[in-house]
Amino acid sequence: MSARKSSSRKSAGEFERASAAAKFIHKQTKLRPRIALVLGSGLGAFADEFAGAKKIPYAKIPHFPQSTAIGHAGQLVLGKVDGVEVAGMQGRVHLYEGYTPQQVVFPVRVFARMGVKAVILTNAAGGVNLNYSAGALVAIRDHINLQGVNPLIGPNDDRFGVRFPDMTQAYDPEFRKFVADAGKRLKQNLHEGVYLGLSGPNYETPAEIHSFRTLGADLVGMSTVPEVLAARHAGIRVLGISCVTNMAAGVTGNALTAEEVFEVGARVKNDFIALLKAVIPRIAEAIA
């Protein structure tokens, strides 16, 4: 590992762009959330639960990337959950949409400039673990990055974070305990697992899924990993939650479709919302 001195050439302008976006958002509301959520495919309905919501289309936020994926509303919603101020992204952008890794993580860097201290990253994922079934909610314990890219490659901007961020506990153990505790109280059958990130947009082959299982993956998806890297780079604590919307290729023999993702997301909506409502106040206490 090289210990060359960090350089701020990396994103000449990226820090300023993130700061400008954060300033714009702050001008739209008096809310100053310290918790942010990225709501994945079929999971955006949680933001509709926010009290006193202020909705800002991504298109109005300076430099903010635009969602093109089906089912991603493309707006930032600020409001309160049980009195806790939060910001929720209804939809994210992905590498498969043609965005660069830096564009994919730009919203996370905006959150950092807004003063966010914890981010909840949610996604729809394929179940690799044969003990899972469609509709299962899984707290991410760790990840395997096979996306072939990393948003931290290039000269480092020390204003975002250190050159070599540690990923030993990328997914916060305390936050994962909050999820486990909430699951018991709510009588939800929750899991913990390892998420494997790919670029997409095609679904995986059965042979790939078999190999991922031998690597120790429990879940597979096309998002989240870059956001985790950027969040930890910025010192933001991370909770990752996957909704298993389908069993991965080769498990059932059925073809995979995007429609299935949204159908299952709608089916687990109430459990998903109840879980987040139970966890958010505890995260707020932990970062106070």
Where would I find each of the regions flagged by the language model?
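Zn-dependent metallopeptidase/amidohydrolase metal-coordination segment
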Residues: 222-260
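His/Asp/Glu-rich mid-to-C-terminal helical/loop segments that flank catalytic regions of hydrolases
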Residues: 248-288
